[in-house]
């Protein structure tokens, strides 16, 4: 024995065939933008009832996708707030009371300040792969979230979350696709159960 400790490989216990490379540890902020939201003045009617989707945490429940918000803002409301336009494929992540509720945007929209949304960098992070890590992100958010009034996780705190990641988009997409099919199957069976009773 040469006295050197054998280097441990960074690979998951279960893996899809055809993937052999070690996984790597990456900070979320290296592979995605973390984007907060904002609220136009509620005292100005010209900011509201427009065409721009504007999500609040109460709208995020057990659904996987969101495509239309309860409240909408106008272009003027958007321009006069700190809300940011989020592209389709963004994972909305609630950052205040009820940390870690998530949904995937199917069309562009924005949020109030109760979110730190995850906008994957193209070619570096698969939307459904990161969505499948929701429970891990939620645990971290609750652990580090701090506030005198209520628990909250900041964009800076989200950006430094370290995740073990497949080194290739192909493996991320394979994992994401697997969980997407599984979620779709669960949703289908839940609907069938509703019709039975």
PLM feature spans:
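Short amphipathic coiled-coil heptad-repeat segments
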Residues: 1-21, 191-197
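DNA target-recognition domains and sequence-specific DNA-contacting regions of bacterial/archaeal
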Residues: 2, 6, 29-165
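Amphipathic, low-proline, heptad-repeat alpha-helices and/or compositionally biased low-complexity charged/polar-rich
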Residues: 26, 188-190
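Extracellular/lumenal glycan-associated surfaces
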Residues: 12, 30, 173-185
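Loop/turn elements at beta-strand to alpha-helix junctions within RNA-recognition modules
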Residues: 21, 146, 167-169, 184
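Histone-fold recognition with a strong bias for associated Lys/Arg-rich disordered tails
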Residues: 9-10, 44, 159-160, 174, ...
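Non-catalytic DNA-recognition/assembly elements of restriction-modification systems
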Residues: 14-38
């Amino acid at each position: 024995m040469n006295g050197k400790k054998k280097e441990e490989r960074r690979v998951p216990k279960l893996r899809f065939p055809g993937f052999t490379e070690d996984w790597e540890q990456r900070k979320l902020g290296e592979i995605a933008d973390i984007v907060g939201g904002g609220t136009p003045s509620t005292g100005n009617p010209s900011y509201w009832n427009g065409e721009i989707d504007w999500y609040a945490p109460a709208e995020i429940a057990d659904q996987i996708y969101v495509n239309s918000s309860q409240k909408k803002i106008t272009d003027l409301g958007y321009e006069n707030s700190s809300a940011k336009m989020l592209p389709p494929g963004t994972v909305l992540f609630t950052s205040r009371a009820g940390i870690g509720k998530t949904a995937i945007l199917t069309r562009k929209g924005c949020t109030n300040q109760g979110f730190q949304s995850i906008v994957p960098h193209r070619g570096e992070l698969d939307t459904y792969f990161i969505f499948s890590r929701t429970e891990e992100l939620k645990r971290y958010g609750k652990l580090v979230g701090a506030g005198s009034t209520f628990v909250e996780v900041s964009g800076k705190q989200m950006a430094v979350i370290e995740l073990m990641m497949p080194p290739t988009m192909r493996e991320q997409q394979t994992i994401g696709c697997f969980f997407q099919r599984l979620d779709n199957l669960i949703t289908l069976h839940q609907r069938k159960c509703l019709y039975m009773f």
